[in-house]
Regions:
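Active-site bordering "gate/hinge" segments
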Residues: 1-80, 84, 180-186, 191
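Internal helical hairpin/lid segments
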Residues: 75-136, 141-142
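Short N-terminal helix-initiation segments at or just after the protein's N-terminus
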Residues: 16, 28-39, 87-93, 120, ...
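Cysteine/selenocysteine-centered motifs that mediate thiol-based redox chemistry or coordinate metal-sulfur cofactors
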Residues: 116-175
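Surface loops and adjacent helix of pleckstrin homology
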Residues: 33, 101-102, 152, 188
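Short polybasic amphipathic segments
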Residues: 18-21, 87-90, 97-99, 173-182
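A general structural signal for short secondary-structure junctions and capping/turn motifs
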Residues: 10-13, 19-22, 62-63, 113-115, ...
Length: 191
């Protein structure tokens, strides 16, 4: 069940030219044109295959320089854990230019002065109905009906940025559109 929905979403990500992510009244757009969605199913049958567990996400590296707008992260963030309050991230030309909220300064400190660390590196969708929000992003990002973005590196999964850092931020029940097709709303996949 997890693998099947993960593959469907991965295919939709691959086919899409644009993604629109909406949460808490904020809207973020990004190009996915010619990028390949990746299914993280947790099923590894071939020698050399790898992943992290628990698994259950479909993800993609958005086109560098394409992210525009704002998004509200209201779950957890790698390096911080469960957020004290929602965190608003502002993007221009593919790069996070501001982080507003009680944990904003901590996030900016984690990213440091390296400009590539602020690259919008990933868009992902959680597909694991057994995963739970714990404050540990490796599980939180897999929770069914969530979405996440990441900042920093994406060169290991189809992107072009090697920043030496990769931090994911989880949204609990956003809306996600792929080329005007609604695929996620109110914590439920629309596939």
């Amino acid at each position: 069940k997890i693998a099947a929905r993960t593959h469907i979403l991965s295919d939709l990500l691959t086919q899409a030219k644009e993604a629109v992510l909406i949460n808490g009244g904020a809207r973020l757009t990004m190009s996915l044109d010619k990028r390949k969605g990746i299914p993280s199913t947790g099923i590894y049958h071939k020698k050399g295959q790898a992943g992290n567990l628990p698994s259950g996400e479909a993800y993609i590296a958005p086109v560098e320089g394409s992210a525009e707008g704002e998004i509200i992260i209201d779950g957890s963030f790698a390096g911080i854990g469960t957020l004290q309050a929602p965190l608003k991230l502002v993007f221009a030309q593919g790069v996070m230019v501001d982080a507003v909220g009680p944990d904003g300064d901590e996030l900016l400190s984690l990213l440091g002065d390296e400009p590539l660390a602020r690259n919008l590196a990933e868009l992902g969708i959680g597909t694991n109905d057994k995963a739970r929000v714990t404050g540990v992003v490796l599980e939180d990002e897999k929770v069914y009906g969530t979405a996440h973005i990441a900042l920093g590196s994406n060169d290991t999964f189809g992107g072009q940025v090697a920043a030496g850092i990769h931090l994911d931020g989880v949204m609990m029940a956003p809306e996600l559109y792929l080329d005007d097709r609604l695929v996620l709303q109110d914590g439920e996949l629309q596939i």
